[in-house]
């Protein structure tokens, strides 16, 4: 469901930052310009969205940029400090969490671009599987460095392309970076979450290669 995807984007956003890449604690290190996701995946930061900003908190102009375009990883996100270390220009991603804090790497509006299909169409195409509506303990059950996650979830079984019975207390395990490569479909049912520290906008997606246990 879209709400789960928004949570995951928030959790794994730091992996796109130049700071985690420099420290070698990002699985995306060394992957710029390479295929890191399904070709239908387009992840864009748009400073003209709900959290509109013409400049970041360091005075650098913000620009629209693709973190992932057609499955290919774009440039990493830089604030002024990381840009100086790398000999590059800031990408306009230096933001403060409070007026006392040092600018860290963040985003304005991060959006996973959907396709022209409804959530119901995704479920119909899935035929048999699981429609996950909520996950508990995202920050406890997900590792932002390795990408591994194991989350207590709930939702509905999908049978013959339709929602069947509800399921609760099931465990869903996988890896975020592997999941990106196995996205089969993206809906158009956008949900917007977040606030002044960054907006996350995503629709529901259809994913393969996850491990499910429970009833």
For each of these PLM feature ranges, what is it?
Residues 1-215:
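N-terminal small-residue-enriched
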